[in-house]
Structure formats: structure tokens, C-alpha cells
Amino acid sequence: MTMLNDPSKKYRAFPTIDLPDRTWPSKTIDAAPIWCSSDLRDGNQSLIEPMDSVKKLRFWKTLVSVGVKEIEASFPAASQTDFDFVRTLIEDGHIPDDTTIQVLTQAREDLIARTFESLRGAKKAIVHLYNATCPSFRRIVFNQDKAGVKEIAVNAAKLFVKYAAQQPETQWTFEYSPETFSATELEFAKEVCDAVIEVWNPTPENKVILNLPATVEVATPNIYADQIEWFGRHITRRDSVLISLHTHNDRGTGVAATELGLMAGADRVEGCLFGNGERTGNVDLVTVALNLYTQGINPELDFSDIDGVRKVVEECNQIPVHPRHPYVGDLVHTAFSGSHQDAIRKGFTQQKEGELWEVPYLPIDPADIGRSYEAVIRVNSQSGKGGIAYLLEQEYGISLPRRMQIEFSQVVQGETDRLGLEMTAEQIHALLRREYLQANTPYALISHRLQEENGNSAVDAEVHVDGETQHWRGKGKGALEALVAGLPVAVEIMDYNEHAIGSGTTAKAAAYIELRVNGDRAVHGVGIDENITTASFRALFSALNRSLSQAQAKAA
């Protein structure tokens, strides 16, 4: 079978919502929602190999450590393993006072009874009821009409009240999901939810949670936002209801749907860390939270060690995080492109402590989430001078002058083209040493003596030339001018720069020279030494030898 030329014969567009006075497009998100992690339930049930109790407890502790206050721990009636995990959390004191355990149940009395039994002794708990409400599920899965689906929800809601009353020591919160909400007729979804509300009788002080899932993502995010705004306008006792979002990523827009849903008035978000979950996954709580953070809003979740969180999630889920995953992927703070690297390098140079973050191409400061700057710039055949210069400066304290950056980038480009691979900072530094610092033929500086008198300098340089030692002597107004005067070839110094590498007794000097030999094209040299004069002399010999070697190669 192949794709259809006319897909309308098999698929139909989801209808739009009649909401001409919608207000959500002009709203902004100005505070964090209530967060609920479903990693241990929705996420766990989607794994090829579900977590054992050890992994579950490790994951639970990670969720608590980052600040998630509502955690859906399991489906206690589904298995003894899930039931026992809830008991472990309660009996072994793993639930902090500011954290609420949440569990899920279907609408059957035996399952509801078992679910409440699992929570015995909990200080507070959210019990989450669901049944599917959309036309296809009513017709295909349950063979029920609207009245039958509504009756299932109402009867189960009554059982919640019954079993909660038997454990008055627990502070109960009830949650109801019209599963497949986003594919359900809005009027009917409201009708069922209103009926559940009537049974549970919430108040502004003891609210119920109405969770409105995009169980399968079937439309664009704006339609989901319209559904949420319409629902918030029409649901009974809105002041006694928390509207919760539970989006999936079937169309790749789970985060967008969640953000627009919050703009449309939702109070709460259910999802999983890094977007684990059935099929294409639940909404990624980390992305939504850090999107808020980069808009200047405290997400009330702490991802200061995002790589530590990622390690736990990967090991427990046995699924790697994609290298391009927002905020946490290996490559999301990395630039290979030359123009990007140049912009980032300039941004870092100009970024001042305490000022608004404005580094190009980096929407978040990697340091805020515990990541180093080492991987921000990496060098391959697409890279330019900016990235190379940045790595040398950050890793080795070597600040190449601008024109030398251009020259050396061509050297690096030739090497990356030859290798066909990325080059590390260590490899780039080794290439710099080979190309410049070890350029010692035909002339190798062995030692020098410098005399200063009346503002003039006299140099006696001991040089190794073709197996013999020579002395080159010259005078000038400075050490470099004196050395140039003693050279056997005509040299014109065009530019000179120097700086310290490090500080204190271990500091070294770096010198950079741009010169012409016998009127030929300009070349650069580098010298590094504890003594600044020696460093400058080594830089001159580096450039001199490179120029002569290039001229010889050209002549050949």
C-alpha cells in the first residue's frame, strides 16, 4: 500500500471550534502551573520493559528532588507490583509533606476498592478516575451510547465518595478525566463532567481536578486551546475546579498545545520528563518548564542538574534522550557552523554578569541547568574562525589576533576536510603547536642575549642553521627591531600582539607576529614562553620559518 493521492477519501479534518470571541491568543503565561508527573504510570506503562520497584523508587526520589508536588505513582489495581509500590511509598515515608501521591483507576468497583485500599494511611492523595467519551470509543470499544458512558462516570464517582468516607484520616482530592476529551463533542464532555461534579460536590477550598486529555493528538494546538477556553467558560462551579492538561505528541505539538492550553485558562499540567509515554509520548514537562524559565518565569521546578536528571530517566526508562531534544540533548547547545560560532563567541565576550541574557543562538545560559560551555562550540568542516578561536581561548588561554584566526581556520579546515571528522579542542591545540610552535626549520632559535643601553637594544641570537650554529647580531630601538636587523633576509613586521596565559608564578606569555619576508605575502607566527621577550622572538622565528617553507613549497 502507498500513500493516497486523495487522502480525504480516508481521513477527515478535525472540525474547528465555534468560538469567535476567543481570548486566549492575547493572553500570556505569567506563572507556573501545578505540575503532575505521570512518569511512573503513563510513562512506565509505555516501556518495553517496565521499571522494577528499585527503579521506580529511584525515579520517585528524582521527581521529588526537582520539585514535582503531584506524582502519579501507579495503577494500583493493575498489578501486585503497582499496589506494593504505593504501599512502600506510604509505609517507608517516601512522600514528603508537601508532595501528593496520585493513582489511577478505571470505573469498576473492584478496581476502585483496591485503589483506595492501596492508599490506606496516606496523609493526602489524588485518586484519578477515567473513562473514554469520544464517539469512536463509544461505538467501537464500548458499544455504549452517551447515556451509558455518562452513567459509568457517575456511578464510579459515587463509589469514590463511598470508599473515601471509609478512610477519613486521608485528605482526598478527586480527579476525573473524560479520556479522549480532545476528540469528544464539547457539549457532551461538559455534560459528563458536570454530572461528576454534582456527585463530588467540590468547593473553592476543596477543588476537584478535571483533566482534559488530548489522549491522541488529532488537531492543531489552537483547536485544543479553543476547547480548553470553551470548557472553562461553560463548566459548572469553575471556582471549585482545577482544569488540568494532559497532551500527547502524536502530531509533534504536545508542548505547543500545552502552552496554548495554559493561555486558555488551564491550571495544571500532567506529563513526563523528556516526553516519555505512549506512542510518541506525553508532553515533556522539562521543555514546558524551561520555556517558562527562559521567559523570566520561575517554573517552580529545579533542573539545575539537568544531566543528572537525564541520567536517571535514561537508565530507568532504558530509552536514550535524543541529541537534539530541547535543553538536554547532547547537541542543543552546540554550534558547528562558522557564522553561528562567531556570533556565540562575540555574545559571550559582551555578556556581563547580572545583565539580561543575550548570547545569540543560545536561548538559555547552559550554566543555569548545570551544563558547561565546553560543548557549546565544536569544530568540523563547516566551522569557521570564531569557533576555533573560542575553543583555544576557553581551553588554553590562547587569544589569536583576528587576522591570524582567519589564517589558522584555513589550516584547521584543511585538516577537517582531510579527516572528515569533528576536531576537539585538544586536536586543534595540537595542530596549532605543529603548525606554529614547532616551525623550527630552516632556522631554530637556541638562545639569545639582549643588552639595553640609552633606549637602544642589541641582540645576539644563537641560531641552528643546516646543522651548524650561527650568531645573528643586530641593533634597534627595541628587542624585536634589533633581532630583525640581524636577520639574513628582509623582514617587515606588520602586526604584533601579546598577552599573558594564566597568572602568578605559573603564568606564561604568548606573542603573535604577522610579517612579510622579502616582500612576499603576510604570514603569522606564535611564540609562548615564561619570558615575554623570548616569546616574541619565538613568534618571529615561527613566522619566518613558515614563510620560507611556504615559499619553498610554492617554488617546487
From Swiss-Prot:
Which cofactor does this sequence's record say it needs?
Answer: Mg(2+)
Give the location in the cell: Cytoplasm
- One short Pfam name that applies is IPMS_D2
The residues that hold Mg(2+) are D42, H246, H248, N282
User: Which enzyme class, named as a word?
Assistant: transferase
Q: Cross-referenced NCBIfam families, in alphabetical order?
A: leuA_yeast, PRK03739.1
Q: Which family does it belong to?
A: Belongs to the alpha-IPM synthase/homocitrate synthase family. LeuA type 2 subfamily.
- Return the protein name: 2-isopropylmalate synthase
Q: Which organism is it from?
A: Pseudomonas syringae pv. tomato (strain ATCC BAA-871 / DC3000)
* Gene name of this polypeptide: leuA
